[in-house]
Amino acid sequence: MSANLPAVPPAAPLNMRVQSLRKAPGRPPVYTPLRTHLARLIAFGGALAIGTLGSWHMLKAFGDGRSTLLQYILLVFFALTFYWVAFSTTACLAGFLPLRRHKAALDPDGGKVALVMPVYGEDPAMTHAALLAMAQQISQTAIAERCEIFIISDTQKPDAWLGETRALHILRERSPIPVWYRRRAQNVGRKSGNVENFVRRWGGRYAYMVMLDADSLMEAATLTEMVARMDAEPRLGLLQTMPRLIGGESLLARAIQFAGALYGPIVARGVAAWQGEDGNYWGHNAIIRVHAFAESCGLPILRGRNPIGGHIMSHDFVEAALLRRAGWDVRMDPDLGGSYEGL
């Protein structure tokens, strides 16, 4: 469909002001539901109670005599690990609270949605096959006319770059939705700089961007539901899914996949319950409101030398915090299936 299109769409710049990490802007009021407070009480209060009780019993197990330094060191490490195990348990218990029913209604006049895949030398056969599968599914949904694929490449090696362009030509011939491709000559800021460059140059073209990793795969029904929830909730800045691991071939990889499939949904419900609208962002398999991201998530360059200074590497949770600081809801919805990532 898009084989004869130019490599990139017309420029639609969006200003992305660098944020201060030292001085917060005036924060609009945010509402935390009673359900979230209750989940936090169960998760953190329960872990505190269980961990304290376990540590007290460990101390009593030392006997009535004078404890030694080694015993106190043992107690400290026992408490640290036991509190962690206790929190894992109580956080899952919080997930048994009833899930909030989220609004979902597609806006017939809604803006465009970019499926953004940053790449850096990955196998183009794998990445483009995943994008083609998603494009073919999306073409059968109500959001087909709104969706475009945008590959933002930071690939530096010439052979890998040529491989990307060859695979791109095939993808554009076969894809039922538009496919755009941009490669930076220098990967300034790495992945966060790659995404920032996209937002600054074409952010004004899109209402939302679905962030994908090179090994991400998402079902069209899930993408449609995510867009519908964003359309229905104008204060929702970021919606994260719980990706399911796929593609493992070794025995260990298969075991990890099985474990994730077995108790991952329970963990996801617990995390979603106690985080509420103060959620996290894992950098992929999520949908983001572009203008909210642009106005809130311009990352500064930290003062000092690496690794303390320089560009922020673990940028995703910082971006989630900046969105929430600006008053946007950041949420993970564990009921959204059909989201996958390679192991």
Residue ranges of predicted features:
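N-terminal membrane-anchoring/stem segments of glycan-assembly enzymes
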Residues: 1-107
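Internal catalytic domains of large membrane-associated glycosyltransferases
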Residues: 2-3, 87-343
